[in-house]
Structure formats: C-alpha cells, structure tokens
C-alpha cells in the first residue's frame, strides 16, 4: 500500500504579501518613471491579501466598497484609515493621473507593510520590520 505524502504546509497570506511588498520596494519602479505600475502593483498586492486573509471580494470591489466589508471581519479598526489612505492614493495614481510625491511612495509601502502585519497577528522579528 502506498501512502501519499501530506501536502506541503500553506504559506500564510501575510508572509506572501510581505515578500511581494519587499520585492516591489527593491524594484522601486517609480524611479524609472513607472509610478502608475507601482501603484497598480501595490493595490493588487494589498487587495489580494485582503481576499486571502479576510475572504472579502477586494479584487472586484472599489476602495469605497472594501472598507465596510472589512468592518464585518476581524480587520483591526485602527488600521482602516491607513489602509484606506494607501488604496486611495493608489486609485489617484492609477485613475486620476495624480501620483503622490516620491516620499509618499516609500511611506505607502511602509504603511502597507504595517497594515499587513497588524492585521495578521504577525510579531516582527526581522530588523527591517521592528520600527513600524
């Protein structure tokens, strides 16, 4: 009798998302004039995380629609305003051709990381994440 090996453990959504945010930060697409692409990627990464972690239809919802959906979950209230600001700035860069300043790009990445860690229960141990 052949016994099938157990499936590999699932990688938690916050780990995947933090890796994606780190890769996006390393690429710094805004430095190559790709601000729209940066904000499209940032928004997609966060929305995918919200779908996986909180089972809300974030990919097909507007920013305005996402926020009330998250209130019905265990998403931390204190992170709502930060998330909304990052998604709003992403929307403005993508749709209104109104990109934030270069300093805002790094801040939005920082805030995205902060939202993910606060909403996942993740306890930072890596020095990159300890000062959030």
Label each region the model flagged:
Residues 72-132:
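Cytosol-/stroma-facing membrane-proximal "stalk/adaptor" domains immediately downstream
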Residues 15, 19-22, 44, 48, ...:
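Generic structural signal for well-ordered, non-membrane alpha-helices
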Residues 29, 54, 62, 102-105, ...:
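Short linear functional motifs in flexible/disordered or boundary regions
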Residues 24-27, 52-53, 73, 96:
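Alpha-helix C-capping/helix-to-loop hinge sites
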């Amino acid at each position: 009798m052949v016994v099938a090996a157990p499936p590999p453990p699932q990688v938690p959504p916050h780990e995947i998302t933090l890796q994606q945010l780190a890769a996006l930060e390393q690429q710094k697409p805004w430095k190559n004039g790709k601000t729209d692409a940066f904000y499209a990627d940032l928004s997609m990464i966060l929305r995918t995380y919200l779908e996986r972690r909180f089972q809300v239809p974030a990919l097909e919802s507007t920013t305005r629609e996402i926020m009330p959906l998250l209130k019905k979950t265990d998403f931390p209230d204190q992170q709502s305003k930060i998330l909304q600001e990052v998604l709003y700035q992403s929307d403005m860069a993508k749709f209104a051709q109104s990109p934030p300043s270069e300093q805002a790009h790094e801040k939005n990445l920082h805030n995205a990381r902060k939202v993910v860690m606060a909403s996942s229960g993740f306890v930072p141990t890596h020095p990159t994440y300890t000062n959030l």
